[in-house]
Amino acid sequence: MARKKIALIGAGQIGGTLAHLAGLKELGDVVLFDIADGVPQGKGLDIAESAPVDGFDAKYSGASDYSAIAGADVVIVTAGVPRKPGMSRDDLIGINLKVMEAVGTGIKTHAPNAFVICITNPLDAMVWALQKFSGLDPKKIVGMAGVLDSARFRHFLAEEFSVSVEDVTAFVLGGHGDDMVPLVRYSTVAGIPLPDLVKMGWTTQEKLDAMVERTRKGGGEIVNLLKTGSAFYAPAASAIAMAESYLKDKKRVLPCAAYLTGQYGVDGLFIGVPIVIGENGVERIVEVAFSAEEKAMFDKSVNSVKGLVEACKGINAALA
């Protein structure tokens, strides 16, 4: 049986962490690509030299030529500039749009059948542009956002309740920005919805609202602490969960930025919604019912993404 091939575009902090996790989880062989020659080769060699200690047999290679990603089963894109303190994800749009054009061309030429996961910010606009530049089937390209945002929410909830994170489910939809939509009534501890836990006296509505707000600002909190870049452990773990569901046909239900064709009243945009990821890529888009308040929050989030997509079209006429 041929081993799967995982191509990582961008060998920065997230790229290196992705490469390590892919090996530890035995997902396949890894090629790291980066325009900074030497960096992908060095990180690949370093991780390969950890394999005898950790007991995994993934093969690692590094490259600065897109031909190295040929035939990849999964491509995970982290290339671009990260946020610095004081920046929003949206401030990155001009620089990272140019990066998506180069990456999209590389994927189109060398790995047109891959399942592609985009992590580059501003996420919802970059995955939209990457699909346009690569010409990929929209079912084969998603953005990593909701898995990370939900994980942050789950962490805060587990800490508040002093319970295992495994027993906490959380639901964060919408764009990957400050207008994201953490859905409290669909989030649970051991199947008990959060509003019920408030009634049971486990927490207060004020504390719950504060955790929702902290989730929205979760990326910025880490940017402000690190001062030199943005989060990478949790984003990498989130993308690996998505890749694993595809490679192993697990059919996990995960919130991801997926291409909508009328669902949720949205057409032609990538927005964070629950999807089923299996061997065919995005196999189902799960449409949940919103309350009036949730719908208003979701629509606001969609409008933010629309604005970013329009900005992309303004920068690059080929996208219009």
UniProtKB/Swiss-Prot annotation:
Molecular function terms from GO: L-lactate dehydrogenase activity; L-malate dehydrogenase (NAD+) activity
Pfam families (UniProt xref): Ldh_1_C (PF02866), Ldh_1_N (PF00056)
Binding site for substrate: R83, R89, N121, R152
Signal peptide: none
Keywords: NAD, Oxidoreductase, Tricarboxylic acid cycle
EC numbers: 1.1.1.37
Domain of life: Bacteria
Gene Ontology BP annotations: lactate metabolic process; tricarboxylic acid cycle
Positions that bind NAD(+): G10, A11, G12, Q13, I14, G15, D34, N96, I119, T120, N121
Reaction equation(s) it catalyzes: (S)-malate + NAD(+) = oxaloacetate + NADH + H(+)
Residues annotated as the enzyme's active site: H176
Family: Belongs to the LDH/MDH superfamily. MDH type 3 family.
Protein purpose: Catalyzes the reversible oxidation of malate to oxaloacetate.
PANTHER family: L-2-HYDROXYCARBOXYLATE DEHYDROGENASE (NAD(P)(+)), L-LACTATE DEHYDROGENASE
Entry protein name: Malate dehydrogenase
Species of the source: Methylobacterium nodulans (strain LMG 21967 / CNCM I-2342 / ORS 2060)
